[in-house]
C-alpha cells in the first residue's frame, strides 16, 4: 500500500477513527471503546490505566471520570495526555497525543443521566483512588447514597468528562511479516492544519 486507500482513506482523522471504532464494535468481544490512557504526575512519573472512550467529537475524544481521582489530578496538572486503542480482532490500533480540557457542562450532565441508576449511585459513593477499608464499607456508602439521592441522582460536582484534543493521531494496521502500515496525522496546535505522513513499520 503506497497511498492512503481502503481503511486509511479520508480527509478527516476523526472520521477514520469513528469508522474503525464502528468496525471494532462489530468484531471485538469486549469493550471495543477501551483505551489505555497515559498521564504523568507532578514529578514526571508516568501512569497508565484502561478507561472507556465515550465520544468522538468533531475535534476531540471524550471520556468521563471522577475529578478527584489520580488520573484527573494528573490530567489537570499536565494539561496533556496520550492514549492507544488496540483491537485484536481487527489487528489495528490508533494512538493519540494531545491537549486536555474538562467536559463539565450539558454534555456531561446528559451522559451521566444516560447511565444506569446503580452506576450513578456508585459515582456518588466512590471516593476514587483513595484508600478503602473494605468492600463492605463501600457498599454501606452506596446504601447511604441511595437513601440520600433516591432514583434520580444528579451528576456529582466532582464527576465529569475530559476532552483530548489531538495534535497527533497515528493509525496502524498489521501487515504480513511485520511490514505494518502506519500513517500519522500531525498538527502544531489544535487550530493548525493536519499533515499526514507514512511511517516505516
UniProtKB/Swiss-Prot annotation:
Instruction: Tell me which EC number(s) this protein carries.
Output: 1.4.3.5
- Kindly indicate whether the keyword Oxidoreductase belongs to this entry: yes
Q: Which reaction does it catalyse?
A: pyridoxamine 5'-phosphate + O2 + H2O = pyridoxal 5'-phosphate + H2O2 + NH4(+); pyridoxine 5'-phosphate + O2 = pyridoxal 5'-phosphate + H2O2
* Cofactor descriptive note: Binds 1 FMN per subunit.
Disulfide pattern = none
Source domain of life: Bacteria
Where FMN is bound, by residue? 49-54, 64-65, 71, 93, 128-129, 172, 182
* One Pfam family here: PNP_phzG_C
Name its GO BP terms in alphabetical order: pyridoxine biosynthetic process
Associated pathway: Cofactor metabolism; pyridoxal 5'-phosphate salvage; pyridoxal 5'-phosphate from pyridoxamine 5'-phosphate: step 1/1; Cofactor metabolism; pyridoxal 5'-phosphate salvage; pyridoxal 5'-phosphate from pyridoxine 5'-phosphate: step 1/1
Entry-linked PROSITE patterns: PYRIDOX_OXIDASE
Keyword list, A-Z: Flavoprotein, FMN, Oxidoreductase, Pyridoxine biosynthesis
Keyword Oxidoreductase listed? The answer is: yes
What's an example of a GO molecular-function annotation for this chain? pyridoxamine phosphate oxidase activity
Chain positions recorded as substrate binding sites: 54, 111, 115, 119, 178-180
The Swiss-Prot or TrEMBL record lists the needed cofactor(s) as: FMN
Function statement: Catalyzes the oxidation of either pyridoxine 5'-phosphate (PNP) or pyridoxamine 5'-phosphate (PMP) into pyridoxal 5'-phosphate (PLP).
Q: Which NCBIfam families match?
A: pdxH, PRK05679.1
Q: Indicate the quaternary assembly.
A: Homodimer.
Q: Which family does it belong to?
A: Belongs to the pyridoxamine 5'-phosphate oxidase family.
* Name of the molecule in the record: Pyridoxine/pyridoxamine 5'-phosphate oxidase
